[in-house]
Amino acid sequence: MAALSGRPPAEGSRVAVLGATGCVGRCVSAALAREGHEVLAVARRGGPAAAGHVFAGLDVAAVPPAELARLLTRHRVTTVVNVTGGWGTTEEEMRYAHITLVERLVKAVTLMDDRPRLIHVGSIHEYGPVAEPLAIGEDLEPRPATMYARTKLAGSELVLDATRAGRVDGLVLRAVNVCGPRTTRASFLGAVVDRLRAADASDPVTLRVADARRDFIDVRDLAEAVVLTVTSPATGQVVNIGRGEATAMRELVDLLVAASGLPPQAIRVEDGPIASKGGGWTLADIRLAGELLGWKPRITLAEAMRATWQTPAD
């Protein structure tokens, strides 16, 4: 992993990572620790994913804001990073994970005497579907078309509104689709990994792949962006994080199959419908991330697919 170019952490820097045991949170926690930050790992469940960090078992969306504020104060947290995901399928589940949680988090931060910086990781899908070949810039007016995208946008707007009102020091990263180590099984790539592991040359696996092109980022590159954001003076802004490339889903699957080492006859690929939380085309304009954070993606998709295969979700 390349050295980061941001400012060194201040003495006594402690970062609370919410969602610390998920694919993104686990990688973010490790990256922060490597750069000298103390990490308070917050998640509903602990286990090996939280090893090496101070851990607090907590459902942030379920606790009163005052209780969360006391926890953050007790651990002298200087920055909160929200990488909670939520792969719920119902409107109620999405509102709980994407809106209720952020409402309580923002309220908790405002209750603290020494208010920590708040970094919220949102989604590129908040912008809604866009036409090829548009590169999605931060100035694009969001027009989300799915419940997932609408609730994710609502969560991001809570952070941005509170920052504009001077109640928090917040910043939103809008990340593209994530791949790499421990990609969640609930995602398309995670599901493909499970299918490939069950493949048999005598009984080929059929994969239905949409005719779509999407931007994907290795979770380790996303983690570097989060670390740089923690020490950046930027506030009140949205910053896109991606590779800045739209890759055909079939090409991505081909890279994953190659990483698996399976013979070609073990896989049969068929056309499938576009079933996305956003749209069939995503390509992030990532110039602002370079200007504000000194960040750029470093890991190739081939490397990311090897890591996706070699280090599956627990």
Describe the predicted segments one by one.
Residues 132, 160-214, 219, 254-257:
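NAD(P)-dependent short-chain dehydrogenase/reductase
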